Structures are given as structure tokens and as C-alpha cells.
Amino acid sequence: MSLSVEAKAKIVSEFGRGTNDSGSTEVQVALLTAQINHLQGHFAEHKKDHHSRRGLLRMVSQRRKLLDYLKRKDVARYTALIERLGLRR
């Protein structure tokens, strides 16, 4: 269910400020988005997996909180991230 190490490293290098920047808000949102997209494919096949669906809702909520924080702190970074990830907000 989780992302591979290579996929995480690619996301960190793409969205982070450095190679080891895994804690910035942009990287956290990008990692959550990748995991959410992966789980949506899982639910197309396993419709009754309610245990994992709860985890998905938790991830969506966490991503929303991080995006709200970024919007409060720096609107320019927020809009750039939304554009890069293709989110609807």
C-alpha cells in the first residue's frame, strides 16, 4: 500500500528544497497526494475494504490541514503547489 523508496525519493527531490528535505509542507503534501492516488486505484478493485478507506480519509484530512496551513503562511507557494499537483482547490 505504501510508496516505494524510489518513488518517495523522486517526490522529495522534485518538491523539496534539497535532496534530504522530506519535512517541508510541499513535500508532505506531494507524498500524501501520491499515496492517496495509489489508494484510489486500490479501491476500484477492493470496494469493501473499509479499514483502508478509513486510512485514506485520514490522509485526505491531513493533506487538507497542511494545505490550509500553507495557504495561511504563503499564498504564492500554495498556488504553485496546487498547480503542480493538479488539485482542485
Swiss-Prot record:
<dbReference type="InterPro" id="IPR005290">
    <property type="entry name" value="Ribosomal_uS15_bac-type"/>
</dbReference>
<dbReference type="GO" id="GO:0022627">
    <property type="term" value="C:cytosolic small ribosomal subunit"/>
</dbReference>
<comment type="similarity">
    <text>Belongs to the universal ribosomal protein uS15 family.</text>
</comment>
<dbReference type="GO" id="GO:0003735">
    <property type="term" value="F:structural constituent of ribosome"/>
</dbReference>
<protein>
    <recommendedName>
        <fullName>Small ribosomal subunit protein uS15</fullName>
    </recommendedName>
</protein>
<dbReference type="Pfam" id="PF00312">
    <property type="entry name" value="Ribosomal_S15"/>
</dbReference>
<keyword id="KW-0687">Ribonucleoprotein</keyword>
<keyword id="KW-0689">Ribosomal protein</keyword>
<dbReference type="GO" id="GO:0006412">
    <property type="term" value="P:translation"/>
</dbReference>
<dbReference type="GO" id="GO:0019843">
    <property type="term" value="F:rRNA binding"/>
</dbReference>
<comment type="function">
    <text>Forms an intersubunit bridge (bridge B4) with the 23S rRNA of the 50S subunit in the ribosome.</text>
</comment>
<keyword id="KW-0694">RNA-binding</keyword>
<comment type="subunit">
    <text>Part of the 30S ribosomal subunit. Forms a bridge to the 50S subunit in the 70S ribosome, contacting the 23S rRNA.</text>
</comment>
<dbReference type="InterPro" id="IPR000589">
    <property type="entry name" value="Ribosomal_uS15"/>
</dbReference>
<comment type="function">
    <text>One of the primary rRNA binding proteins, it binds directly to 16S rRNA where it helps nucleate assembly of the platform of the 30S subunit by binding and bridging several RNA helices of the 16S rRNA.</text>
</comment>
<keyword id="KW-0699">rRNA-binding</keyword>
<dbReference type="InterPro" id="IPR009068">
    <property type="entry name" value="uS15_NS1_RNA-bd_sf"/>
</dbReference>
